[in-house]
Amino acid sequence: MRKKEDKYDFRAVGLAIKEARMKRGLTREQVGTMIEIDPRYLTNIENKGQHPSTQVLYDLVSLLHVSIDEF
């Protein structure tokens, strides 16, 4: 039986994404359209710390110029 692994707390990264988006004056709808995700998915990433797929994380940090090195 496998042990349940501790999951990374993604809330700090989500907050950094939200701050970068707002700094650039972009709405969730605009970002969602740009990277082809539902704005509700972005809301969950930003506010609830939902873990995005690797591709979505890459798209967000590339678009918004967020460095994830500090996390």
What annotation goes with each model-predicted range?
Residues T54, L64-F71:
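Short C-terminal boundary/hinge segments that cap the last helix of small helical domains
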Residues L15-M34, D59:
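Short basic helix-loop element that most often maps to the first helix and adjoining turn
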Residues G49-S62:
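Short, basic-rich loop-to-helix N-cap that marks the start of a DNA-contacting helix
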Residues E29, R40, D69:
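Key DNA-contact positions within bacterial/archaeal DNA-binding proteins
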Residues Y8, E19, E29, N47-K48:
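Residue-level marker of alpha-helix boundaries and capping positions
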Residues E36-H51:
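Recognition helix of helix-turn-helix/homeodomain-like DNA-binding domains
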Residues M1-K23:
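A short, Lys/Arg-rich alpha-helix, primarily the initiator
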